[in-house]
Amino acid sequence: MTMRSAVFKAAAAPAGGNPEQRLDYERAAALGGPEDESGAAEAHFLPRHRKLKEPGPPLASSQGGSPSPSPAGCGGGKGRGLLLPAGAAPGQQEESWGGSVPLPCPPPATKQAGIGGEPVAAGAGCSPRPKYQAVLPIQTGSIVVAAAKEPTPWAGDKGGAAPPAATASDPAGPPPLPLPGPPPLAPTATAGTLAASEGRWKSIRKSPLGGGGGSGASSQAACLKQILLLQLDLIEQQQQQLQAKEKEIEELKSERDTLLARIERMERRMQLVKRDNEKERHKLLQGYEPEEREEAELSEKIKLERQPELCETSQALPSKPFSCGRSGKGHKRKTPFGNTERKTPVKKLAPEFSKVKTKTPKHSPIKEEPCGSISETVCKRELRSQETPEKPRSSVDTPPRLSTPQKGPSTHPKEKAFSSEMEDLPYLSTTEMYLCRWHQPPPSPLPLRESSPKKEETVARCLMPSSVAGETSVLAVPSWRDHSVEPLRDPNPSDILENLDDSVFSKRHAKLELDEKRRKRWDIQRIREQRILQRLQLRMYKKKGIQESEPEVTSFFPEPDDVESLLITPFLPVVAFGRPLPKLAPQNFELPWLDERSRCRLEIQKKHTPHRTCRK
């Protein structure tokens, strides 16, 4: 069976006609005339498509379109037959599924088959009724049927616009317009798929896009609403994402600002630290200059004061000869005395003078000979007193900042009274300021590292004049010796003391490792036992209600509330752990059990003790 599209067209009966004539007209239109090319084949599947008689598409008034005039070949209201749109002229409008579609009209010379196959005059006018067509998406083609009754709504008006389909007899007609709905199937299908086409037609009628009248508009509005809602949801989601990104950007900016502020603070602190270090260096450098000036001034003053004394001693020494060897040594001390006086700082000479004068008769190793005179002994004492101040100066090297409190009043006569008072105190005291760490962390090591080379310079400067002093000056100077190190010889196999291979090493240390592991296990067991014992004690104390005494945390440093007495002195006590250190007189250290009598007693006791042996 060839695939083609059959167009059925029927005209409405006259208004005054009988219903029997109308039925005959419909039957004749259904069966076809002599000019019907489809013949009985198309009338054969007419009963199957009785559904096409259902109400057609709405009128132009219902769809809003203008009524389309009938073609020129449709004159007279008597009968309408098969329409072949081969020679139709476009330009007329008709109402379809989606709106008005141009309906091709045949030329005036064509013959239209009506009832009885009467020809229609070419000049006859078209009836004012609109012509409608419907396209069925069946496999044999698109069948277009024009309604022949009053303009009643048709169930087929549920989809989009359908163009007029060309028949198989006139392939030269205009091409059909594309359907917005489901496209028609290929024309190669067989006639056995008519039932499937009917089911698809039902589905099109039931679909929301194929609904006619107000239902189609409402479904389209609902679809548009859903699309709008989806778009709104998408916009909201994108706005939320943008807000989240903006928040992240703001947080990152704030973190960046805080980090920049921290970096600026650190830079400022570093600059302040550098400035402080530079100030300290300037202070130290400035401190050296006034010290040197004061030392030079003091040395000049002392030289002027001591010049007459030195002249007297120099005159007294050659006038009286020495009869003993030791007096000769004292005579030779005249030359180093002059050298030491010129080069050594004489800041501490005056306070030490009184100490040496009081101590020299007791502890001076030089004994007066019977042949020596009084002037000789005085000269020796003066020389010894001037040489002795170098001992504390060289042995106790202090930085110049700590020795500054003794600059001014060194030559003042009050120093003698201070020295006597210091000797009378029962505890150690000093006039130099020293650092006392009282519940404070130790200072940073940076300034100590910076001041260390300066201390070495002062030590070297103090040692130079003492090295010139000669035999009389006793200095605690470390002895530097050069040790010549010989190169190592090639080791002989006999000289190697032990084998250091991995296997030998592991064997040697395996036993020690095992012992260490055992000790560790034993420690863990003891710790567990102690914890168990503590738990049991806690249970017992809880049952008895005994409160366990907590150990008090004590410290060597006394509390300020425990002050016993106040003492205001110009001297600083040497304090250790909050207590002043007692002043001990210099004497030989002796132990009671090292005495001869105690030794004898211990030996006697050992001899008399019987030897006991355990007998079994």
Swiss-Prot record:
Start-end of Basic and acidic residues biased regions: 378-394
Tissues and organs where the protein is expressed, per its UniProt entry: Isoform 3 and isoform 5 are testis-specific. Isoform 1 and isoform 4 are ubiquitously expressed. Isoform 2 is expressed at low levels in the testis and brain.
Matches recorded under Gene3D superfamilies: 1.20.5.170, 6.10.250.2000
Coiled-coil residue spans: 215-284
Cross-link annotation Glycyl lysine isopeptide (Lys-Gly) (interchain with G-Cter in SUMO2), location: 303, 367, 380
Protein's UniProt keywords contain Cytoplasm: no
PTM per Swiss-Prot/TrEMBL: Sumoylated with SUMO1.
UniProt-recorded name of the protein: Male-specific lethal 1 homolog
Organism: Mus musculus (Mouse)
Phylogenetic classification of the source organism: Eukaryota, Metazoa, Chordata, Craniata, Vertebrata
